[in-house]
């Protein structure tokens, strides 16, 4: 299901017919703050509803979502993120955590299931 803040934000997007990106954790490895299935809605202005763990991972997810919303990236993506440093291998070694997110553009006039 969806957290209440995601439902509220998505209802606003639908009312305004504004697209958004839904990010869902589909796998995680090592030490991570959120569980598989956790969702976050990324709005066109870069703001979010919900959280997939914060920090650099959410920053990178917001960057990718922005590109998806402008059409410079495919509307569905499976992306890997690691905590910590810029280099993912160093980040995995330093913090011991990584995750995969499935990101999909939701059209503002559609229902989220």
Give short role names for the model-derived ranges.
Residues 1-113:
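Segments forming oxygen-rich coordination pockets for charged ligands
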